[in-house]
Amino acid sequence: MRKPLFQNNSIINKYQNLINQINNLEDNLKILTDSELRAKIVKLQKQYKESQSLDFLIAESFALTREASSRTLGLRHFDVQLIGGLVLNNQQIAEMKTGEGKTLVATLPACLNAITEKGVHIVTVNDYLASRDQVSMGQIYRFLGLDTGLIQNDMTTSERKKNYNADITYVTNYELTFDYLRDNMSLNLNDIVLRPFNYCIIDEVDSILIDEAQTPLIISNNIETPVDKYIIASEITDYLEVTIHYKIDEKNKNIILTEQGSKQIEQILRIQDLYDPRDPWIPYVINAIKANALFFNNVHYIVQNNRIVIVDEFTGRIMPDRRWGDGLHQAIEAKEKLQIRQKTETVASITYQNFFLLYPKLSGMTGTGKTTEIEFEKIYNLSVDEIPTARPILRKDLPDLIYKDQFSKWNSIAKNCNQISLSGQPILIGTTTVEKSEMLAQLLNEYNLSYQILNAKPENVRRESEIVAQAGKKSTITIATNMAGRGTDIILGGNINFKIQKELYDILTLSKNFILLKKINIFQSQLRYQFNCISQKFLSVLSSLLANQQFLKLSDIDILRILRKNDRVSLSTTSYQCSIRFLIKELIRYYKKHQEQENKIVKNLGGLYIIGTERNDSRRVDNQLRGRCGRQGDPGTSRFFLSLDDNLLRLFGGSKVQNFMQTQMLDDSPLESTILTKSLDSAQERVEERAYQQRKNLFDYDDILNKQRNIVYFERQQILKSVSNQKNILAYGEQIITDILLELKNEKTFSKEIILLLENLFGKNLSLKYVEDSKLLINKFTFYELKTYLFNEFWLTYQSKLNELAVYGDGICENLERSIILINLDIIWREHLQKMTLLREAVGWRGYGQRNPLYEYKRDAFYMFEKQKENLRHLVIYDLLRSSIL
């Protein structure tokens, strides 16, 4: 038995017993054949069906997964990785440092929970990571007889359904959430792609549940857009001056018009009132000023193919499917002189906060979770456990250097890059915007330094994985916007997998072209000249490959796809795939020696040098950048270069800090100060607390809408699954009659109005309006008699309609009823979302009247929801009783 790890560590002590059980099973599993291992999983599935509990299956399942990983990937889970898997299975967040193998750790709880056959979702932040992880980790699952699915944005409904029905599915948060919304808009049961939620593991959980928590996922329809107003409002901003006509609130990203500004705009527009509800100009003007004063090209967005594309402030990635709401996106389009696209109205929406709480079992992984532990616990009921590293961390985090202004800071960064690069030590520089990454690139050009740049520009995004993977090579300088969610490990000396993929692609395409051009005699000498790794054995296998007609029919893109999906379990389906696999092994053998030498050289140089160019609003983003070096016990160094006019210091540093620094900094020399570092830390904490309160406030409000959404979606699913909805129709009609009679009883409505309302609803005349002894018949009945009479009238009318429709064939009535209910439910829900948005904006003003806005919102939202349910009943009965088949 192995020695227990770090006995003084509480988390290891907590799971030590299970770790011992897993390790004790290892030797016995090693002697089993592949088929015997798979039989073990089948046995566990049977045990689960009998007990309906996974608790007694954990040790064996984890041990089986570890052995499967060793046999397929050549990777054996460390004990600390087993702990990470146990934390995830325990519905917690595992904080694991960069390079500690989060992707591999997720396979442990994934295999265990897949035993239930209810499905496991592993959520990543982008399509590349989902595809990469499904291909690589899928080898473990398939070895154990479990199938894996992958969701990509170009998949059809049937493809999505098939992949969601797999035991373990890799999917992005974006695709998963939109599939949920689309499922709840479906009019056909066959179009639903998701099955009931079971277990979810979120990679980069802080990015999804914290950074993107405030961004609702919205499905929308286009609506009429006053294009002229956006253009005119944009032109008006040329005649406005900051502080005179408007003030900028940078902290809240808001604009406040001054009295002089309002008058100036009214004069330009030749109107009396900017706020006139019949023709309001104020939202267009405010958005136009925001577009010019708060949102900048190559910072908050880029212009791509004549469209505004948002840049994610946390990851530096573009988000082509996202648009700012409330007319802001159109205002920015007007500012950039682009075609103004139509505004939209919300059809369905949900936040990540509420979506992921739908899972009965939820867990997540991140490299930086402890800084937001309180928020995870309060909102998601997820605690954060810090997983020990497999090797000691050798990274040096040097004190921040603070300069008096931006000019001094950026010049110093370029100068330091020049000095560090003389030794060959690789450098990774993190910037906050596209604009700043390109400005730094220009400064490095002045020193004649070569570099790679990674930002939201399309030409850079295409090479993202390669750029990040090779950032650890000797003498490499890499400039990258925020490094969150980049996903690729930076290996000192360079990542040979990317090098091999590129080199073999070049070899195969070059050779194939020589063969097709019938220049057989010169292609081998050309290869030897261009690629120094070519051996005679390599050439022999390559020659046989080039004689394979199936291979010669492949396009260059097909070859690239095969290389990217190199899979040791499923690759050898054809002879040419076997040959490619051999060539890959040959290249690995050749390059591994060189990579090991390069790795030692870079380690001796001090490892990767990280330069931060600005403190971010969140400590997590800074830590993600720092965590890119010093992976798996490697050496590394990190340092942040700051200036007095950085946004964090300028907006949140406080006047005392500003005054202290101004008196201390008389030239371009940097300042190192413990006081300043603490001030920066506290400034970040204030920003984080502020952001947390905003997210908490959003959650409190959205929770009300979420409860209503859950009711609507549950009701919708029941209707969709029901063979017949006659009970619902009868209940709707009877409830309408009861509500109307209660209004009559409470003297809220006159008898004549009631009769007209019922006749309009039923589509037939009622004898209640006849006069007897100078009185309407309706007034001669008791409440109970009237209710009984009207119920009978409704039942007869409904039955008559069913008989009328039945002649068109079996199932016509059922399908029509279902469609009418669902279509009207969707219309009512869409209207309700618009009203809730307006209510959310309106209740904020009630705070000025000493009323609690949240309480007001809850109360009004309840009444609005009940009213919408009443409207739904009326619409369904009205449409059904007037329906006909054309």
Q: Where do the PLM segments sit?
A:
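Conserved P-loop NTPase motor core
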Residues: 1-660, 664, 714
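Extended, charged helical/alpha-beta scaffold domains that provide interaction surfaces
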Residues: 306-309, 315-318, 568, 603-606, ...
